[in-house]
Amino acid sequence: MDDLTAQALKDFTARYCDAWHEEHKSWPLSEELYGVPSPCIISTTEDAVYWQPQPFTGEQNVNAVERAFDIVIQPTIHTFYTTQFAGDMHAQFGDIKLTLLQTWSEDDFRRVQENLIGHLVTQKRLKLPPTLFIATLEEELEVISVCNLSGEVCKETLGTRKRTHLASNLAEFLNQLKPLL
């Protein structure tokens, strides 16, 4: 496990939860995750769940993605998706507003790996360098990704070579995120 990335993710999650506590006097609330089982759920309303991050259980790797492509995935991606269970968190990096993706449960972790495989299949078909997404943007065709060759974080337009460098590594990126509520 990449300790710098794990600590940066935990630190951002703490900043996010602290900001939520400050503004709402509660743990984060999600309507999107209502009805989806998770160890993160601490209470439920009639249409939403309150959640708090929990330690990841299970194998701490995305080896299913590696096996599917017979490639080695950046260690930071293994760490990013297996440090904790949590709800997705809204954030800002510079002037970019994003939703930082997280695994909600072991079932969700399997789904995330399937989506990463699908993303890599498309990139391979289009002969694009491999990236692994970590966040979504309001524009549906744009994501925040980690380049699997260099480890740098970029804003990427899906299906194209258009990429904008954001940070040299994932820990640096996470350390610069500001929570958005």
From Swiss-Prot:
<comment type="similarity">
    <text>Belongs to the Syd family.</text>
</comment>
<dbReference type="GO" id="GO:0009898">
    <property type="term" value="C:cytoplasmic side of plasma membrane"/>
</dbReference>
<dbReference type="InterPro" id="IPR009948">
    <property type="entry name" value="Syd"/>
</dbReference>
<keyword id="KW-0997">Cell inner membrane</keyword>
<dbReference type="GO" id="GO:0005737">
    <property type="term" value="C:cytoplasm"/>
</dbReference>
<protein>
    <recommendedName>
        <fullName>Protein Syd</fullName>
    </recommendedName>
</protein>
<keyword id="KW-0472">Membrane</keyword>
<dbReference type="InterPro" id="IPR038228">
    <property type="entry name" value="Syd_sf"/>
</dbReference>
<comment type="function">
    <text>Interacts with the SecY protein in vivo. May bind preferentially to an uncomplexed state of SecY, thus functioning either as a chelating agent for excess SecY in the cell or as a regulatory factor that negatively controls the translocase function.</text>
</comment>
<dbReference type="GO" id="GO:0043254">
    <property type="term" value="P:regulation of protein-containing complex assembly"/>
</dbReference>
<dbReference type="Pfam" id="PF07348">
    <property type="entry name" value="Syd"/>
</dbReference>
<keyword id="KW-1003">Cell membrane</keyword>
